[in-house]
Amino acid sequence: MKNTFSRLFGFGDKESEFELQDESHEEIDKKVYEEIQEIPIVNITPNRYQPRTVFDDARIEELALTIRTHGLIQPIVVRQYEDDKYEIIAGERRFRAATKLGWEKVPAIIKNLNDTETASVALIENLQREELTAIEEAVAYQKLIELHNLTQEALAQRLGKGQSTIANKLRLLKLPEEIKNALLEKSITERHARALIPLKNEELQLKVLQEIVEKQLNVKQTEERIAKLLEEAKPKRKAKQKAVSRDTRIAMNTIRQSLQMVADSGLNVNSEEEEFDEYYQITIQIPKKK
């Protein structure tokens, strides 16, 4: 029977595959080629596909103290890529804690996985936890899409998430590096970052980012600040302007809401509004491919 990983991403049955569940419930199958071995720490390298870029030193220290008291209850999982050289598949936090304790060797289970399987296991294992930042989560989604040639919709179905969730995370990757770094460092929240997306202008985005950090703006204050900037950026209306009917306002708002729904679904739609004496003009560009 195929395990969770096989069902999600279509790999064949292998005795060396393992269930991707929450770490507290993860069960490593005790099958052939999976006996626990003591591997020198100097021969182990972190997973190159690890989506987590920031490790909380305090949390690692706490884990190290727990391991010192109770031992390493669950071995790390690795794969061999050269003679006596191993790459972590799962358990980098445990590996870091063991290193902090000064261990020379660490208990490990060796798995026979290729690059694609190794990357996918590392990404999914981390996605199942709540400790990833929004940017790390977005990077993980993007890598899975690229590894398995998936659409956002297909990835959402396989991970049991809404497509809008995937789309909203991926939109964060289009922000400037300074904003993504602020998210990684938790200087701002995901909602702060998402509020910056409509600005489009990178200079304005960075200006507001600085205000958020320096003035400690909450999300509501940030949204109000951005709304003001967007209003100021609109073309100045002519002094003499005919009154706009209620039906016209409703029609315009309906179109704007529809465009936002399409954008939230992951489709990169561009639109431009122009106002003339007798009518409004909305130009919409919809890509043929996502």
UniProtKB/Swiss-Prot annotation:
It comes from Bacillus cereus (strain ATCC 10987 / NRS 248). Residues 153-172 bind DNA. It comes from the Bacteria. The keyword Metal-binding does not apply. Its main location: cytoplasm. Effects nucleoid occlusion by binding relatively nonspecifically to DNA and preventing the assembly of the division machinery in the vicinity of the nucleoid, especially under conditions that disturb the cell cycle. It helps to coordinate cell division and chromosome segregation by preventing the formation of the Z ring through the nucleoid, which would cause chromosome breakage. This is Nucleoid occlusion protein. GO terms for biological process: chromosome segregation; division septum assembly; positive regulation of sporulation resulting in formation of a cellular spore. Keywords: Cell cycle, Cell division, Cytoplasm, DNA-binding, Septation. InterPro entries: Chromosome_partition/occlusion, HTH_ParB/Spo0J, Nucleoid_occlusion_protein, ParB/RepB/Spo0J, ParB/Sulfiredoxin_dom, ParB/Sulfiredoxin_sf. Belongs to the ParB family. One of its GO terms (molecular function) is DNA binding. It is found in: Cytoplasm, Nucleoid. PANTHER family: CHROMOSOME-PARTITIONING PROTEIN PARB-RELATED, NUCLEOID OCCLUSION PROTEIN. One of its GO terms (cellular component) is chromosome.
